[in-house]
Amino acid sequence: MLILISPAKTLDYQSPLATTRYTQPELLDHSQQLIQQARQLSAPQISRLMGISDKLADLNATRFHDWQPHFTPDNARQAILAFKGDVYTGLQAETFNDADFDFAQQHLRMLSGLYGVLRPLDLMQPYRLEMGIRLENPRGKDLYQFWGDIITDKLNEALEAQGDRVVVNLASEEYFKSVKPKKLDAELIKPVFLDEKNGKFKVVSFYAKKARGLMSRFIIENRLTKPEQLTAFDREGYFFDEETSTQDELVFKRYEQ
């Protein structure tokens, strides 16, 4: 079973590390090409392209400039411990033990605009380059064209190594668009998380993101490998709703708190 999640805009390069083990990202040659493109942008251009403040644009111009491909624990950090958004609040990788990291390294992948695909222990240097950004590059008008089949091929390699051909899509739409489902050699399952609001169940972005992290942790902690095991997910008040679920879309609901 291969879990897919999105990266986060918020990064943490200060907290104590839960592990000293690390690996190197597998697509750094491609990342380097994107960095070369990004370095041609001025801070005001970055601000417009990403829709961010001047201060953040300056920070990211500096990050692009400082980025260099020889990753060490001194200049980079394991991806699963560097990302700090809502998904990662649910995941709580900082509390993983060695066996959890082992399982995650085999079964969890983070999609990334700059790095393509990251394994949990892959070192990464700080960046901001969302998959949906229209950064023109030698391969096309945006990052989807840049990555083409590369991300899908890398996921198929991981699936081949595991032998259980199931992908659990816990990534956002923006990021999953970088994957070619028809070329993915796996059964695709998408968990959906609905929260009750004024008597109706709907996707509430903040809760749904955290729930994706909770589900990822649930799979890792319990070493799940079969799709039917996912329906037991019951963290923080969620329950499986068989009636509205289908074989490839598992619906989990939670009553208003």
Swiss-Prot record:
Q: Which InterPro entries does this UniProt record tie to the protein? A: YaaA (IPR005583)
Gene Ontology BP, a term? response to hydroperoxide
Report the superkingdom from the record: Bacteria
Q: Which GO terms describe its cellular component?
A: cytosol
Similarity annotation:
Belongs to the UPF0246 family.
Q: Which PANTHER family match?
A: PEROXIDE STRESS RESISTANCE PROTEIN YAAA, PEROXIDE STRESS RESPONSE PROTEIN YAAA
* Record protein name field: UPF0246 protein YaaA
Q: What is the lineage of its organism?
A: Bacteria, Pseudomonadati, Pseudomonadota, Gammaproteobacteria, Enterobacterales
Q: Which gene encodes it?
A: yaaA
